[in-house]
Every structure is written in C-alpha cells, then in structure tokens.
Design a protein with these regions (language model features):
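A conserved hydrophobic helix/loop-capping motif in glycosyltransferases and polysaccharide synthases
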Residues: 4-16, 20, 27, 36-42
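Active-site-proximal specificity loops/subdomain of glycosyltransferases
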Residues: 45-110
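Acidic donor-binding/catalytic loop of UDP-sugar-dependent glycosyltransferases
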Residues: 109-110, 116-133
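Conserved donor NDP-sugar-binding/catalytic core segment of glycosyltransferases
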Residues: 125-161
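A recurrent flexible, glycine/aromatic-enriched loop bordering the glycosyltransferase active site
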Residues: 171-191
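Catalytic donor-sugar/metal-binding loop of nucleotide-sugar-dependent glycosyltransferases
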Residues: 206, 218-233
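Acidic donor-binding loop at a coil-to-helix junction in glycosyltransferase catalytic cores
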Residues: 206-213
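Terminal low-complexity segments of carbohydrate-biosynthetic enzymes
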Residues: 252-407
C-alpha cells in the first residue's frame, strides 16, 4: 500500500500541534498515513536559564505524542537531555533533514512526502485531494496553495496581509513570465513523490531557507505543479527563532522592517522575460540584456555562458543549462537589485500589477488611496482574497499549459 508520509518539525509547539494533528488524523485516506514529528532543540538549552520554558514545553510535547498511543504518529526525539542538536547544526533545516532521512529509510519511490509545520492546519479533504492528484497524473512535486488566517491583533494582521500580498505578487509574476521556478517557498506547503525527494537530495541542514533551496533543487530536476483545490492554513504569528520565514516576516512587518519584502514592479520581471525570450539566441551569441550584464558582474565572470554552450549540443540542452545556472536565487537577486533602482512605492507597484494583469478587477475602489500602513484590514484582506483567487486561476492554467506542452 502506498504511504502518505508527513514530516513536522516541532519546537515549543504545544499551543498548535494538537490542532494540527487533529486536522491530519481526522482525514480519511486510502493510503497508509504516517506523521513523523521531530521535537528538537539545541542540547545546550538544558543549561541556559532563559530557555527553560521552551525546554519544558518540548518535554510536554514529547509526553503528549507518547500518550497518543497512535501508531500513525512517529516521534523523533531530538530534545531530551543529551539528544538535542549540537550548537553548530541547530535549526529547522536540520530538523527537516532528520525527518526526511528517517522517512526515506522506510519509503518506496511512489510514496508521497508532505512537508508540514506544527502550526499549520489543513482544509478538510486536503490529504485525499493530494492522493487523487498524484493518483491520476504523472506529477512529481506539488507546491500547495496556502492561506494565512486573521487573528485578533490588527498590527499582526496588517503585517501578515502585507507579507502574503508580497508572496502572491511574486508568484503571479513568475507564472506570467513562465519561469521554471514558479513556486512559493513555504515549508508547510510541499508535497512530492519520494523518488523526486531522492533526486533532489532532500532537505539540507540550513538554519532557515531550507524550503526554498529544496524547492529550487526540485525545480531543477522536474516540474513543480501548482494547483490543488484544497489549501493549508499556516499560523499567523510572530517568531524570531529563524532569520527567515513567515513568522519572522510578520514580526519584521510589525516592527516596520519591510525592506526585505518589496512588492515588485512588473517592469523588473519584464527584464527577466526579455532575457528568457533570447535564450535560444544566446546559445549562438552574446547579447547584453540587463539581466545578463547583472549576472556577469554578480558571478564575476564575463564569459559565464560559454561553458554552457560548450557542454550543449542543442538549443534545448542550452536552455536547460541556462535555467540551471540562472536559478531561483539568481533571479531573486537580480529582481531585488533592479527594484532598488526604482522610485515607485509598494502600493504603486501592486496597483500596476493588478491593472496590468487583471484589468477587469471589479472593485477598483480598493486600489484608490491604497496604503499598507493606513488602509483598513478589511480592505487589505479583500485585496489578499482577490490575489488568492487570481493566483489559483493562474496556478491551474500554468499546470494545464505545461501538461499540454504549450509552455
């Protein structure tokens, strides 16, 4: 029987994990369901007075899991005294890696791996929808749709909505330029066949950003599908445990630190599209687009394309090699550099995006006097919902177009 293998890292998560587990274990699936939970912390925390609350919470989590007496739930204890991380390799990245390594020992290539977070609940029918998708299509990887819930805190909601709009704006642009790196990096929203996990090398042990680099490696080895009619609900909460990720982004937003998450203008993505359109020509000759010029300086190599040409015997081979070289990280670095040259505001860039791609937007009043700082939460939430709906349509069409070979 095929297995659904869910991986959840957990540190100080007793306030969230029971609800997450309930949403997963109450699902009716035809596959064998296993939920692996890695309760983790640096071992040195046992000796640090200011970490005792987290240490105690982790012990409570371990007891909670053990008391479930549910064969579907497998505990990985990297928190008890003497079992925690050595300081140099602590973090969610190593937790995800240990989860993946443990799962791979007991998995077949056609089993389905799902990356989750302890604070994320799933929409009813989510697991069966994933099953059906992987049953009826030759799909290797799925970037799962997501939606952050509102909470009873205006500043937190404002920051979350601003961040989610940033994420959706970014993916919408990537899909519009047909980038092979069209995905949103959320550790709670990834599903893939075990065969694809193996091909991509699994998670690495970065302190954070491990979901981005895992998806980037997956995108280099296979297509990432985007559409599912169910979604996951990552928690809307503050966190300073890692330097990146949703919790840190929301905390930064509450503190007014938004420079890491610019709402990109369509103009900067057009510069990527311009280069994409010339990839076949670049196989034959040098063409200095703005993106190519940036890469020459960024890579400290005026001739970075020549080895790609030398190792390619056709345009299609060169095209693949180009995308392997100019990957999701390089694209993001270029976009940030180009966006920094522009004097437009985040609000202006969002309005331009919506007016360019979705001129039929019904409530144009939403865009009038738009301000991430001052517009009402209701207004920002309507914009978020509008972008979610449009993104879902684009996800669906992107998958269909790639399936029939039109992109």
């Amino acid at each position: 029987m095929r297995q659904l293998l869910i991986a959840i890292p957990a540190m100080d998560e007793m306030n969230f994990l029971p609800q997450t587990l309930n949403s997963l274990l109450s699902e009716h699936v035809s596959s064998s369901l296993k939920v692996y939970i890695c309760v983790n912390q640096p071992d040195i925390w046992w000796n640090e007075a200011d970490k005792q609350e987290i240490v105690s919470a982790n012990m409570d989590t371990i007891r909670y899991i053990e008391n479930l007496h549910d064969d579907r739930v497998i505990l990985l204890d990297y928190a008890s005294k003497g079992k925690g991380w050595k300081e140099k390799k602590s973090g969610v990245g190593i937790a995800r890696k240990m989860l993946m390594d443990s799962i791979l020992k007991n998995a077949d290539n056609d089993d389905i791996f799902l990356s989750m977070d302890a604070d994320t609940i799933v929409e009813e029918g989510y697991l069966s929808a994933v099953e059906n998708l992987f049953d009826h299509q030759e799909i290797k990887v799925l970037g799962v749709p997501y939606y952050h819930p509102l909470v009873q805190n205006e500043a937190q909601n404002r920051s979350m909505l601003r961040y989610e709009i940033y994420l959706r704006n970014y993916l919408i642009h990537l899909i519009k330029i047909c980038s092979p790196y069209s995905f949103t990096a959320l550790g709670s929203a990834i599903a893939c066949r075990i065969s694809a996990c193996k091909l991509a090398g699994g998670f690495d042990s970065r302190q954070s950003g491990e979901d981005f680099y895992f998806l980037q490696r997956l995108a280099k080895s296979t297509n990432i599908n985007l559409y599912l009619d169910k979604k996951v609900f990552p928690a809307n909460r503050l966190s300073d445990r890692v330097p990146y990720g949703t919790g840190k982004a929301i905390e930064n937003g509450v503190n007014g630190q938004l420079d890491k998450y610019p709402v990109f203008s369509p103009q900067v993505f057009e510069k990527v599209r311009e280069t994409y359109m010339l990839i076949d020509d670049l196989y034959q000759q040098d063409i200095d687009t703005e993106m190519i010029t940036f890469m020459k300086h960024h890579l400290c190599d005026e001739n970075f394309l020549q080895p790609l040409r030398n190792n390619s015997t056709s345009k299609s081979q060169f095209r693949k090699a180009f995308h392997q070289k100019i990957d999701a990280l390089r694209i993001f670095q270029f976009l940030r550099a180009e966006q920094a040259k522009m004097a437009t505001t985040d609000e202006e860039n969002l309005k331009t995006t919506i007016e360019t791609y979705f001129p039929d937007v019904g409530e144009k009043s939403l865009l009038a006097n738009l301000s991430f700082q001052h517009s009402s939460i209701a207004t920002l939430n309507k914009i978020r919902n509008f972008m979610f709906q449009k993104e879902q349509q684009l996800r669906y069409n992107f998958d269909k177009n790639r399936q029939n070979g039109s992109i």
